[in-house]
From Swiss-Prot:
Keywords annotated in UniProt: Amino-acid biosynthesis, Cytoplasm, One-carbon metabolism, Pyridoxal phosphate, Transferase
One function term, GO molecular function aspect: glycine hydroxymethyltransferase activity
Lineage: Bacteria, Pseudomonadati, Pseudomonadota, Betaproteobacteria, Burkholderiales
Residue sites binding (6S)-5,6,7,8-tetrahydrofolate per the record: 122, 126-128
Organism: Cupriavidus necator (strain ATCC 17699 / DSM 428 / KCTC 22496 / NCIMB 10442 / H16 / Stanier 337) (Ralstonia eutropha)
Protein name: Serine hydroxymethyltransferase
Coiled coil, from the record: none
EC assignment: 2.1.2.1
Length: 415
């Protein structure tokens, strides 16, 4: 019925096809610095676009509620085995459709409404699923938050004191806008001292952790959640890693607890990405991600910008824009006009509203994927500073855009 030559997107839906082509061109032409974005390989995209999207497979490998699952069982088991090998985990669930749903799965497995949880404050670098008031985690649970000290590192002493006082049932580590290394072992000891579960959301750092360039939380945590995109460079989705003793509870929480049939085409993409992440080339890539981030931060500092925490020890950094008298919202827009894509982001104790902000968040994974190294990272840092020095000079923006175009032309994403 479906002849491949006749049922192509451009023939069936020219509007969607045009938008896809335009987005492809945008990705090729713009320098991508959003820390949570990356470029997947053609192999990952091919898996996601396969016939596996047709298959319903409620349950788990070998224990399905539908027939005809023998081949999707192979795919899901490969994903499980590979992600366990990648991070040294005892057990894994690869079915969560997102990082947020992975977190929700852990909460559903071990918490009851009204229990106390403790996570990093969203205002100081945490994630909204760690207890933000408007999120399910903030509505269903009693939330206490820890934050940063005067040096803009995690205040571990205050964290321990708060945990001893409030006795949360679950302590959450991980962040969406924190540049330094997190001491997972220390937080784990705090959790153990009060009998709390310890969960790490490593979504931002997963690729670095897989390559050994950022501390691995898996030996220290009861549960580790992650997205499979971002620095891991896979499809958009989630994963839960856990101690073997928690596997049954987590599996039940995901299905039938909060999800029905898994997205087998996405799980196939995850399996492919995990195989890619097990290669020496992926380790070299992540080493370059960290090098590029360091050079980018150093360049911005040399140009008079303040980096929150003073440096980066990972792939991500927050830039304080107050000295330039420009908001994060405005900087995001103007840098976008120069074909440099960033996102506005609150800085610690930000006086601006969340939709305005006093900062921008930058990350190095995507530009490193397209081949940028230290020289290019330095150029990018100077281009950003050039824009922020004269944000309302049209000629300046045009000049930066031309220089950005020269860079992206030299380093195509999909070539």
């Amino acid at each position: 019925m479906f002849e491949r030559s006749r049922f192509t997107i451009d023939q069936i839906d020219p509007e969607v096809f045009a938008a896809i082509q335009q987005e492809n061109q945008r990705q090729e032409d713009h320098i991508e610095l959003i820390a949570s974005e990356n470029y997947t390989s053609p192999a990952v995209m091919a898996a996601q676009g396969s016939q596996l999207t047709n298959k319903y497979a409620e349950g788990y490998p070998g224990k399905r509620y539908y027939g005809g699952c023998e081949y999707v069982d192979v795919v899901e088991q490969l994903a499980i085995d590979r992600v366990k090998q990648l991070f040294g985990a005892e057990a894994a669930n690869v079915q969560p459709n997102s990082g947020s749903q992975a977190n929700q799965g852990v909460y559903f497995a071990v918490l009851k409404p009204g229990d106390t949880i403790m996570g990093m404050s969203l205002a100081e670098g945490g994630h909204l699923t760690h207890g933000m008031a408007l999120n399910m985690s903030g509505k269903w649970f009693n939330v206490v938050s820890y934050g940063l000290n005067a040096q803009e590192d995690i205040d571990y002493d205050a964290l321990e004191k708060l945990a001893q006082e409030k006795k949360p049932k679950l302590i959450i580590a991980g962040a969406s806008a924190f540049a330094l290394r997190i001491d997972f072992e220390r937080i784990s000891k705090v959790a153990k001292s009060i009998g709390a579960y310890f969960m790490v959301d490593m979504a931002h750092y997963a690729g670095l952790i897989a390559a050994g360039v950022y501390p691995n939380p898996v030996p220290h945590a009861d549960f580790v959640t992650t997205t499979t995109h971002k620095s891991l460079r896979g499809p958009r989705g989630g994963v839960i890693l856990m101690k073997a003793e928690h596997e049954k509870a987590i599996n039940s929480a995901i299905f039938p607890g909060i999800q029905g049939g898994p997205l087998m085409h996405v799980i196939a993409g995850k399996a492919v990405a995990f195989k890619e992440a097990l290669t020496p080339e992926f380790k070299e890539y992540q080493q370059q991600v960290v090098k590029n981030a360091a050079v980018l931060a150093e360049t911005l500092i040399a140009r008079g910008l303040r980096i929150v925490s003073g440096r980066t020890e990972s792939h991500v950094m927050l830039v304080d824009l107050r000295a330039k008298n420009i908001t994060g919202k405005e900087a995001e827009r103007i840098l976008g006009e120069a074909h440099i894509t960033v996102n506005k982001n609150a800085i610690p104790n930000d006086p601006e509203k969340p939709f305005v902000t006093s900062g921008i968040r930058l990350g190095s994974p995507a530009m490193t994927t397209r081949g940028f190294k230290e020289e290019e990272a330095r150029i990018v840092g100077n281009l950003i500073a050039d824009v922020l020095d004269n944000p309302h000079d049209a000629a300046n923006i045009a000049s930066v855009r031309e220089q950005a175009a020269a860079l992206t032309k030299r380093f195509p994403v999909y070539g």
